[in-house]
């Protein structure tokens, strides 16, 4: 199911790129469109970034093998960010003025998305974020150059609450739900949505940040043992995930 979701995201992103290509006259002159690939093959999240980067390259190669988009072939170049916002902005600045124009940016990072979303309108650069990024950018009236696809972090957080609501037969009044989250722009994204849902549904929201990379969580799970929430939502990434599972087992 995960593979299908990724494949669908790639297909939609490529279709979106097709609508962002130059006019037919310009296409006739230039039968190539450049696509920057911001990747993180190194750094603490490399286990996530490497297959993602490989998959994007494979998909673009497949598109080209089938004739491109309306006959326009996709050229691409990787720029390593190591999931670092500063490096990501450097990649954006270097690639945005690539000769022939840039199709769109898929930053593969929430922090980088935050940083370049302010720059995108002035640069007339499109920011495509399949399933991640800046949740507020779903409002296209404000974020005209952001294209979130397949939902966002608020969508995911709301799905979690809906699932718990089903288990609790439609009422969360008086319940206590803990959010253990990666202390980064990515990890903080679901908080506004969960706070709204807590106010609406009448449950208490405990917010427990975990400092990156997430290998030290004993104090966090001590709070879980003390507070005894009814549910724990884990918003993790990289090495934080297996560490959380081990600590949860020790806490149970």
Segments (PLM) and residue ranges:
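Extracellular/periplasmic Venus flytrap/periplasmic-binding protein
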Residues: 86-90, 135-136, 144-251
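Beta-alpha junction/loop-to-helix N-cap segments that form part of ligand/metal-binding clefts
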Residues: 32-34, 47-54, 66-140, 149, ...
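Signal peptide-proximal N-terminal region
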Residues: 30, 54-76, 169-172, 199-202
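C-terminal segment of classical bacterial N-terminal signal peptides
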Residues: 15-27
């Amino acid at each position: 199911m995960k593979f299908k979701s990724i494949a669908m995201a790639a297909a939609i992103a490529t279709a979106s790129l097709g609508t962002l290509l130059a006019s037919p006259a310009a296409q006739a002159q230039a039968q190539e469109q450049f696509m920057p690939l911001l990747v993180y093959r190194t750094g603490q999240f490399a286990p996530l970034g490497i297959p993602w980067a490989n998959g994007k390259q494979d998909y673009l190669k497949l598109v080209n093998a089938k004739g491109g988009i309306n006959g326009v072939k996709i050229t691409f170049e990787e720029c390593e960010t190591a999931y670092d916002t500063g490096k990501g902005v450097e990649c954006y600045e270097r690639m945005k003025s690539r000769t022939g124009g840039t199709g769109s940016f898929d930053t593969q990072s929430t922090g980088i998305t935050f940083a370049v979303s302010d720059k995108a309108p002035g640069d007339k650069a499109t920011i495509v974020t399949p399933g991640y990024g800046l949740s507020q950018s779903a409002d296209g009236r404000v974020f005209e150059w952001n294209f979130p696809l397949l939902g966002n972090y608020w969508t995911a957080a709301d799905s979690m609450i809906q699932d718990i609501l089903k288990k609790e037969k439609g009422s969360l009044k008086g319940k206590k739900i803990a959010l253990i989250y990666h202390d980064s722009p990515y990890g903080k994204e679901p908080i506004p949505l969960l706070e709204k849902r807590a106010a609406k549904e009448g449950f208490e929201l405990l917010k427990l940040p975990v400092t990156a990379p997430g290998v030290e969580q004993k104090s966090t799970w001590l709070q879980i043992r003390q507070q005894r929430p009814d549910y724990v939502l884990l918003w993790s990434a990289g090495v934080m995930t297996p560490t959380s599972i081990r600590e949860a087992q020790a806490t149970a």
